[in-house]
């Protein structure tokens, strides 16, 4: 196979879903049937091939996305297994950035759950074409048709049903292929390796015809010529239908819906056929956005083997045998071990040593990789998640990834002096792997503070510190990551002067501070004209503001959601310096924040509780007592779904309360929504504690 057309044969896909929808099991089966796993790994026995960290095998949830290469028909499939727990959405976000297509796995009983919505929105953000696999069709309460409706209602997506289930719950036997109009039935005794096609059962004929018509009505809209043919009563061929499904999937006109039971080994091979048949190859994606370093211009770069080398680092992992591994997705050109490339974000050269193709937890050395490939590089010195590696002579920076701010923090202290140094190393390694995990020092207390996306996120970090780095630490109680902001516009004119023999210091700045909408962060703009402040001093002003906004004026929390506009200033030929302007900016900030009617902000979480009807009243009462605002209540099967916005500060230990309120029958999920003002009486308590 030549390198050029090799791109047509590659599928870079992610498998993503809500926790417990059966994502890892589905991936396991794919690896089994494509010949990569000789033994099927069961998640609930703690032996799945993709879940390779000890914590994952214990908890039965996937934390880090392992990248795996396998083959089906004549195609190469690179699979990224993504976590479904809400504390790990960063992993999903990273994976989606480098994928060409995705399979969204849904639980046939629960349907579209909160995390499914989050992942779906993330995939929308990166325009990832996807298909839906409704799993667990063998389970009590599984309902394929209700799931399809939920995909429509909850995700606002256009499902294209291309399979129907044959039998339901314990009688689930196989599927009806609506393209070929055949039933596909699995033999139970052969671990799903043997299946055969037969005529559609008589009791399913009418339903199959109905859904076949719906399928044709939807796909022919993509091609006027075939639509005319269809409307005039001519037969649309199987090849034409498959071509239209592929085109519609790639353009996101609709999302093919398949079904099966990965655990019972049914429906996985047709899912693989659909992955290679309908999801895009890198050629279908065609381009990647980036910036040309020499000109600073944003451009579209073609995905091609013949173009100069460009790749995105999307994951860093500590491997017990190889050390630090950097996973890259190559967009163009090729790379060989021993060659030198440049990290264009850090402007540092990197020498390529070992290159590995990964299969969940074992590895294969390769000497060369090219456009479309996902490989792991060992021993890179300066590259972190989101960096671009590029050809030295034709440098580009690919579109960067955005990472969410952490919402929860903990103080950690090493148990002994021997642990002190090891802890520093462990935390810096873990922070390099995970951009949503931050480490800082509290200067007042001298404590090390770790910040993350939720209690489970930080629990796992501490666990890894203990197991992988042998660091024992004392852990403080979780703290909320409060923020501060201003609520009115103010203008500050500040002059910094210092004269005490020798060279003095002089800088004058006039800055307008104004509030922004929630989520807009901090924005700095210079409107200096006519050289009132020379160009070389302006970065000093921005640096000063950026540094000082980390400690707000109410209780010392970082300031967010405001804009600082530099409108005027003055300088002195001898006494002005970058440092003088930095000091002036900091003083102007202090004054401006106090005049801008500052307010304390707290993270508000979107909480979704699924409960049997009889506990509904108690659960709503409890959420209200936690300052929760109920957003909606929806019936789902034999349960109620309560969605509310609740301050994170009120949610610690909620899992135990919910368990006792509902005798363990209700479950909840929580995801960060936005920052909002803290009521004044509560703000006073928080200030007093600081």
UniProtKB/Swiss-Prot annotation:
Residues 8-283 form the tr-type G domain. It is found in: Cytoplasm. GO terms for cellular component: cytoplasm. The keyword Nucleotide-binding applies. InterPro entries: EF-G-like_DII, EFG_II, EFG_III, EFG_III/V, EFG_IV, EFG_V, EFG_V-like, G_TR_CS. Keywords: Cytoplasm, Elongation factor, GTP-binding, Nucleotide-binding, Protein biosynthesis. Its main location: cytoplasm. GO terms for biological process: ribosome disassembly. The keyword Iron-sulfur does not apply. GO terms for molecular function: GTP binding; GTPase activity; translation elongation factor activity. GTP binds at residues 17-24, 81-85, 135-138. CDD domains: EF-G, EFG_III, EFG_mtEFG1_IV, EFG_mtEFG_C, EFG_mtEFG_II. SMART domains: EFG_C (SM00838), EFG_IV (SM00889). Belongs to the TRAFAC class translation factor GTPase superfamily. Classic translation factor GTPase family. EF-G/EF-2 subfamily. Catalyzes the GTP-dependent ribosomal translocation step during translation elongation. During this step, the ribosome changes from the pre-translocational (PRE) to the post-translocational (POST) state as the newly formed A-site-bound peptidyl-tRNA and P-site-bound deacylated tRNA move to the P and E sites, respectively. Catalyzes the coordinated movement of the two tRNA molecules, the mRNA and conformational changes in the ribosome. PANTHER family: RIBOSOME-RELEASING FACTOR 2, MITOCHONDRIAL, TRANSLATION ELONGATION FACTOR G-RELATED. This is Elongation factor G.
């Amino acid at each position: 196979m030549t390198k050029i057309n090799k791109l047509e044969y590659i599928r870079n896909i992610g498998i993503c879903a809500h926790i417990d929808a059966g994502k890892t099991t589905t991936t396991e089966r794919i690896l089994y049937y494509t010949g990569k796993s000789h033994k099927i790994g069961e998640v609930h026995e703690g032996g799945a091939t993709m879940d390779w960290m000890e914590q994952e095998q214990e908890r039965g949830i996937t934390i880090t996305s392992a990248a795996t290469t396998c083959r089906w028909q004549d195609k190469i499939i690179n699979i990224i297994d993504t976590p479904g727990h809400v504390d790990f959405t960063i992993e999903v976000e990273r994976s989606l950035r480098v994928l060409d297509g995705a399979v969204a796995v849904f639980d046939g009983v629960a349907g579209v759950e909160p995390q499914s919505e989050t992942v779906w929105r993330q995939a929308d953000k990166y325009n990832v074409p996807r298909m839906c696999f409704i799993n667990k069709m063998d389970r009590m309460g599984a309902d394929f048709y209700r799931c399809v409706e939920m995909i429509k209602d909850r995700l606002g997506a256009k499902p294209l049903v291309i399979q129907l289930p044959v039998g339901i719950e314990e009688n689930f036997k196989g599927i009806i292929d609506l393209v070929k109009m055949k039933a596909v039935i699995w033999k139970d005794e052969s671990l799903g390796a043997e299946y055969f096609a037969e005529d559609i059962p008589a009791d399913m004929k009418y339903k199959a015809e109905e859904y076949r018509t719906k399928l044709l009505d939807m796909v022919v809209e993509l091609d006027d010529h075939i639509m005319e043919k269809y409307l005039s009563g001519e037969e649309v061929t199987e090849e034409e239908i498959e071509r239209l499904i592929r085109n519609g999937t790639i353009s996101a006109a609709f999302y093919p819906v398949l079904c099966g039971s990965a655990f019972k080994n049914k429906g996985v091979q047709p899912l693989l056929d659909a992955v290679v048949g309908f999801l895009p190859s890198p050629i279908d994606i065609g381009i990647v956005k980036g910036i040309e370093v020499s000109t600073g211009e944003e451009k579209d770069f073609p995905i091609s083997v013949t173009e100069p080398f460009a790749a995105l680092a999307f994951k860093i992992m500590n491997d017990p045998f190889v050390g630090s591994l950097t996973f890259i997705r190559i967009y163009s050109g090729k790379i060989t071990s021993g060659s030198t490339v440049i990290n264009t974000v850090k402007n540092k050269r990197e020498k390529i040593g070992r290159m590995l193709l990964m299969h969940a937890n074992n590895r294969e050395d390769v000497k060369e990789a090219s456009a479309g490939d996902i490989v792991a590089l060992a021993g890179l010195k300066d590259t972190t998640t989101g960096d671009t590696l590029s050809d030295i002579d034709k440098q580009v920076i690919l579109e960067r990834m955005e990472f969410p701010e952490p919402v929860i923090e903990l103080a950690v202290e090493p148990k002994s002096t021997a642990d002190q140094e090891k802890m520093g190393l462990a935390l810096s390694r873990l922070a390099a792997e995970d951009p949503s995990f931050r480490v800082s020092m509290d200067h007042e207390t001298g404590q090390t503070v770790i910040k993350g996306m939720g209690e489970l996120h930080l629990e796992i970090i501490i666990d890894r510190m203990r197991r992988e780095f042998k660091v024992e630490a004392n852990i403080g109680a979780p703290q909320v990551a409060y923020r501060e902001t201003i609520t009115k516009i103010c203008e500050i004119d500040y002059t910094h002067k210092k004269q005490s023999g020798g060279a003095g210091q002089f800088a004058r700045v006039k800055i307008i501070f104004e509030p922004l909408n929630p989520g807009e962060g901090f924005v700095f703009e210079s409107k200096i004209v006519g050289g009132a402040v020379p160009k070389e001093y302006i970065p000093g002003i921005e640096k000063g503001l950026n540094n000082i906004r980390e400690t707000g004026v109410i209780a010392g929390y970082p300031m967010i959601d405001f804009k600082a506009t530099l409108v005027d200033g003055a300088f002195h030929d001898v006494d002005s310096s970058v440092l003088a302007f930095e000091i002036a900016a900091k003083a102007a900030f202090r004054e401006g924040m106090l005049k801008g009617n500052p307010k304390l902000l707290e993270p508000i979480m979107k909480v979704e509780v699924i409960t049997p009807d009889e506990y509904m009243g108690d659960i709503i009462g409890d959420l209200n007592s936690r300052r929760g605002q109920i957003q909606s209540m929806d019936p789902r099967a034999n349960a109620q779904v309560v969605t509310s916005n609740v301050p994170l500060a009120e949610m610690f230990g909620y899992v135990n309360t919910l368990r006792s309120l509902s005798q363990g029958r209700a479950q909840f999920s929580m995801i960060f929504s936005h920052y909002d003002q803290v009521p004044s009486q509560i703000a006073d308590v928080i200030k007093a504690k600081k």
